[in-house]
Amino acid sequence: EGQVVLLCGEAGIGKSRLVRHLRDQLMGEHYETLQYQCSPHRTNTVLYPVVTYLRQVAGLADEDSASMQQQKLATLMADNGFDDRITIALFADLLSIQGHDQDQLANVSPDKCKDMTLEALVQYLHRLADRSPALLIVEDAHWLDPTTLDLMTRVIDRIRQMRLLVLITFRPDFRPVWAEYSHVTFLTLNRLPRRQSAELIATMTGGKVLPQEVQQAILAKTDGVPLYIEELMESLLETGLLAEGIDSFALKAPLKDMVIPDSLQALLMERVDRLGPVKEIAQIGAAIGREFTYELLRATVEITDSQLN
């Protein structure tokens, strides 16, 4: 029967890395994967992560003609056993595909249309899981729009009848209503203790010893946040503030001259600032989203292929 795992942790604590590790562990297994990626810029966009997933799995592109989009939708529906005109019209409306039996919904109220759409999406997951076990990953659920939150509640309420594992990641300020369900497991990722933080630093330096004062400054500033430790170490190694020896590093200047950003966000911005001409590309990529194709980036930036490569 289906299960749900809720994975809670602050930014940079390792939620996404744990998700990647799970997928690596399942490599070679026969299962379907779905990913709903939430966005801080789309918290009020109805079903944004679901629409993004469906457009990707259907292969829809902005430059597709209306007939091409209709054809791709028909293939997606047929692959998942949907042949009734109303359900196909619901998906067409959700994906903003024009001219595909829209008259089927002409007399349906907005509230009824929303309810029917959510039920169709639950059935989509059910049929997918009927073919093979499925993994649904919902990343950054603290940015879920209300309608997708409603959808997830419906899925979790019925998941015991599906061969489906739902993994939901979120930050501590999100309070999932499903935490007390018997088929839901709640996990919290905490900050690393100093010993494990030191082990992570040693991994980053290839086992070479840092000056004690530098190591203590890193441990104090990062306070056990793994991504902060990794990014700060990368920054120190990139900027040449440390001289590398055979089995250790040495400071090139007094520690007081080293400026260590006060937060992970400030550190990341500092590293972006050092990218030079690549900075604008990185910023455009960040504005697009966590994942994007080369073609989309190429169409967005005003440089040549050779420069982008």
Segments from the language model and where they lie:
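A short hydrophobic beta-strand->loop->alpha-helix junction that borders the nucleotide-binding pocket
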Residues: 8, 34-43, 76, 189-190
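A short beta-strand-to-loop transition that corresponds to the Sensor-1 phosphate-sensing loop
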Residues: 37-40, 168-173, 232-236
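Sensor-1/coupling segment of RecA-like P-loop NTPase cores
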Residues: 151-188
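Conserved Walker-type P-loop NTP-binding/catalytic site
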Residues: 46-135, 163, 179-182, 187, ...
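Short hydrophobic/aromatic beta-strand immediately N-terminal to the Walker A/P-loop
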Residues: 4-8, 35, 135-137
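Conserved Walker B catalytic segment
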Residues: 126-166, 298, 306-307
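P-loop NTPase Walker A phosphate-binding motif
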Residues: 13-44, 48, 52, 60
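Short secondary-structure boundary elements
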Residues: 1, 6-13, 18-22, 50-53, ...
